[in-house]
C-alpha cells in the first residue's frame, strides 16, 4: 500500500466508531414520516464487501486469464447527499486467447442496469462480484462492453488501509470526497479486471461534480463543461493508469499551478489542488515539487508522465499513489529532515508503481521497498550521509521478519499485507528499503542505479517519449542486477527476500584472531563481505566465504564490525528494543 506505516489489519488498526447520519424529520407530522422514511447514510464499513470483492489479484480465472483492457471510458457521478454513485463504463476488451465467457469484476453492492456488447444488449450472469458475458470472445478479437450501474459504494473504515469511499466535510462544512481502491481493488469503484496486469492502455474519465466542487483526476485535463443546474463535468485522459490509480477527488478546491523545465528539455505541468484557507501551507508544499522532481530525474530518470502533469490533491485520508494525482493527507506536518515524507513517498511511486508496475502482488516490494528507500536517499542528496543514516536507522527498527517478502507464487493483496494470512506486512517497505541499501553498498552506485533504471524504464537510456509503462518482477530485477554487477547474486535475494529471518554474523575472537562467519535460515549460502575497522585504521572490506574468514588483529585492539551499518543483519540490540517496545504497547 502507499503509506509506509499502515496499521496492521490483524487488530492493531484504529477503528472508527460507527456513525449514522440521517435527515432530521423530528418536527414533521407522523404521517409524513411514514410517507417519506428517514434516509440513513451508510456508516464506515458499510455496505459490507463480500469475500470475493475483498480479494484483489491472485491466480486469474479462466474467464479472465486471456483478457486485456485496451481502453476504458468512465462516466462517474458521486452524490454526497445520498452517498451513492452513478456510473457508466465503456471497456474495450481484447482476447489474447479464446475466452469462453469473459468476466469483468464489479462489486455486488452496485446494481447493473444495462450491458451491451458491441452495441447489442445482453443479459450477463452476475455471480458474486462479477459480470459474466454470455458469448465467447475468440482469440485476437475485441469487444466493446458498456455497463450502466449505480448503488451505494463501500465506505472506507480507515482509508487508505481499508479501502472505499471517504465522504468527509471541509472545515466549513462542504463536501470533501475521495476514494481509495488499492487493497480491495478497482472493482469497488468501476468495472475492471482486478489484478495488477489489468491496466487499461488508456483511460478517459468524465466526472460530474456538484455545484461549487472541482474534480481533479488522472492524466491530462481535456475540458470542463458546466451544466444548467451548476454541476460541472470534468474530462480527463490518462495513459495506462494502474488499476487502483483511478480515483475520485471532489471538494471546493483551489489550485496552484506552475511549469517545471526538465533537465531532459520537456516542460512538465505542476498542479496542487488544496482546500481553501490553507494557501500559505499549500504554497510551502508546492515549493517542494520542483526540487523533488529534480532529485528523481537526476538519480532515477525522466518523470514518466511529463506529457500529462505532476498532480497532487489534498485528501481526507493519509495518501495514495494515484497516477498523476497523488493523494496527500499529511496535514503539512513538519519533520527534521526538512521535507514532507508523505509527498515524497507517494511521488516516488510514479516511478515505482505507476511506470514500473509489479506483475504480481508477490512482487510489490518493488513498489514499496524502492519508494521507502527514496526518502533517506533524498535526504542524503540534500544533506549528506548523516541524515541518510538517521533515516535508515528509523526504518531498521520497524523490520519485523515475520515472513518472507517474496514467495515466488501468485498472491492476493491480503496475502502480502496481512501477517495473519502469511504476509510480510510492513516489511515490504522497511526490509525492502534496507535490502536496497545493502545491495547498493555491495555492488556500488553505478551498477545499482543502472539496474534500477533498466527496471523502471526497460532500457538504459530513457528519455521522454522513448519508453512506456511496463510490468516487472523480482526475478527481472535479479537478472538486471546480475548483468550490471557482473556476478550472480541469487544468494543475496534468497536470504533477504525469500527468508524471514535475517542473516546473523557470528563473531569469535581469541587472542590475536578474529573469526567471522554467517548463519542463515535453512543454511543458505551467504558470501557477504563485511567491513572491519581495527583501532583508528580505516575500515577494510573482508570477504566472508562459506568457510568463514579469519583475521589477525592485535589482542588489545578495539574492533568495530560494519562501522557504517552497510549490512542488514540480525541485531540483538534491535531485537531487545523491539521486544521492549511491544511490551510497552501491550502493557505486558
What are these regions (language model features)?
Residues 15, 24, 28-86, 113, ...:
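N-terminal, polar/Ser/Thr-rich
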Residues 87, 181-182, 193-344, 373, ...:
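Hydrophobic helix-coil surface modules that form long, contiguous segments used
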Residues 97, 304, 425-514:
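Amphipathic alpha-helical substructures
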Residues 102, 112-117, 216, 489-490, ...:
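Beta-strand-rich binding/interaction modules
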Residues 107-168, 229-230, 547-555:
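A surface-exposed beta-strand-loop module
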Residues 139, 149-203, 256-259, 565-588:
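Glycine/proline-rich low-complexity spacer/linker segments in large multi-domain proteins
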Residues 239, 368-443, 459-469:
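Acidic/His/Gly-enriched intrinsically disordered linker/tail segments
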Residues 290, 327-393, 452:
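Zinc-dependent metallopeptidase catalytic helix centered on the HExxH motif
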Amino acid at each position: 500500500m502507499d503509506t509506509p506505516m499502515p496499521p496492521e489489519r490483524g487488530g492493531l488498526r484504529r477503528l472508527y466508531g460507527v456513525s449514522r447520519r440521517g435527515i432530521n424529520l423530528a418536527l414533521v407530522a407522523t404521517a409524513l414520516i411514514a410517507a417519506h422514511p428517514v434516509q440513513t447514510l451508510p456508516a464506515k464499513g458499510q455496505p459490507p464487501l463480500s469475500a470475493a470483492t475483498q480479494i484483489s489479484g491472485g491466480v486469474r480465472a479462466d474467464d479472465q486469464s486471456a483478457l486485456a483492457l485496451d481502453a476504458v471510458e468512465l462516466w462517474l457521478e458521486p452524490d454526497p447527499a445520498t452517498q451513492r454513485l452513478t456510473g457508466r463504463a465503456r471497456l474495450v476488451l481484447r482476447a489474447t486467447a479464446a475466452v469462453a465467457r469473459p468476466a469483468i469484476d464489479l462489486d455486488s453492492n452496485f446494481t447493473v442496469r444495462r450491458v451491451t456488447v458491441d452495441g447489442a444488449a445482453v443479459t450477463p450472469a452476475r455471480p458474486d462480484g462479477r459480470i459474466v458475458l454470455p458469448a465467447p470472445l475468440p482469440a485476437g478479437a475485441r469487444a466493446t462492453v458498456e455497463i450502466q450501474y449505480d448503488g451505494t459504494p463501500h465506505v472506507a473504515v480507515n482509508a487508505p488501509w481499508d479501502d472505499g469511499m471517504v465522504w468527509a466535510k471541509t472545515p466549513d462544512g462542504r463536501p470533501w470526497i475521495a476514494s481509495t481502491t488499492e487493497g480491495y481493488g478497482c472493482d469497488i469503484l468501476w468495472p475492471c479486471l482486478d489484478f495488477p496486469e489489468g491496466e487499461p492502455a488508456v483511460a478517459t474519465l468524465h466526472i460530474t461534480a456538484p455545484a461549487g466542487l472541482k474534480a481533479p483526476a488522472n492524466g491530462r485535463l481535456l475540458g470542463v463543461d458546466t451544466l444548467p443546474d451548476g454541476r460541472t463535468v470534468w474530462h480527463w485522459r490518462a495513459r495506462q493508469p494502474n488499476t487502483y490509480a483511478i480515483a475520485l477527488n471532489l471538494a471546493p478546491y483551489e489550485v496552484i499551478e506552475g511549469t517545471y523545465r526538465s533537465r531532459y528539455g520537456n516542460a512538465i505541468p505542476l498542479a496542487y489542488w488544496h482546500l481553501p484557507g490553507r494557501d500559505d501551507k499549500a504554497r510551502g508544499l508546492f515549493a517542494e515539487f520542483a526540487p523533488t522532481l529534480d532529485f528523481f530525474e537526476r538519480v532515477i530518470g525522466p518523470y514518466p508522465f511529463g506529457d500529462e502533469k505532476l498532480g497532487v490533491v489534498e485528501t481526507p485520508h493519509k495518501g495514495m499513489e494515484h497516477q498523476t494525482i497523488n493523494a496527500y493527507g499529511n496535514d503539512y506536518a513538519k519533520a527534521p529532515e526538512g521535507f514532507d515524507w508523505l509527498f515524497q513517498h507517494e511521488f516516488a511511486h510514479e516511478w515505482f508503481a505507476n511506470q514500473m508496475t509489479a506483475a504480481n502482488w508477490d512482487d510489490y516490494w518493488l513498489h514499496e521497498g524502492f519508494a521507502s528507500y527514496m526518502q533517506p536517499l533524498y535526504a542524503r542528496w540534500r544533506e549528506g550521509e548523516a541524515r541518510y543514516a538517521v533515516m535508515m536507522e528509523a526504518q531498521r527498527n520497524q523490520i519485523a521478519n515475520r515472513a518472507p517478502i517474496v514467495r515466488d507464487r501468485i498472491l492476493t493483496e491480503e496475502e502480502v499485507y496481512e501477517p495473519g494470512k502469511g504476509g510480510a506486512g510492513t516489511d515490504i517497505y522497511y526490509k525492502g528499503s534496507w535490502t536496497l541499501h545493502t545491495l547498493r553498498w555491495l555492488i556500488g552506485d553505478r551498477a545499482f542505479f543502472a539496474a534500477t533504471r533498466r527496471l523502471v524504464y526497460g532500457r538504459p537510456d530513457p528519455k521522454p517519449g522513448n519508453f512506456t509503462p511496463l510490468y516487472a518482477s523480482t526475478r527481472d530485477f535479479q537478472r538486471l542486477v546480475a548483468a550490471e554487477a557482473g556476478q550472480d547474486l541469487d544468494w543475496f535475494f534468497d536470504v533477504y527476500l525469500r527468508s524471514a529471518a535475517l542473516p546473523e554474523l557470528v563473531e569469535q575472537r581469541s587472542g590475536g584472531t578474529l573469526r567471522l562467519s554467517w548463519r542463515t535460515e535453512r543454511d543458505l549460502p551467504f558470501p557477504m563481505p563485511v567491513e572491519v575497522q581495527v583501532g583508528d585504521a580505516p575500515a577494510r572490506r573482508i570477504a566472508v566465504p562459506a568457510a568463514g574468514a579469519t583475521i589477525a588483529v592485535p589482542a588489545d585492539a578495539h574492533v568495530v564490525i560494519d562501522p557504517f551499518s552497510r549490512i542488514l543483519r540480525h541485531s540483538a540490540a534491535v531485537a531487545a528494543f523491539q521486544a521492549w517496545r511491544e511490551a510497552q504497547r501491550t502493557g505486558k
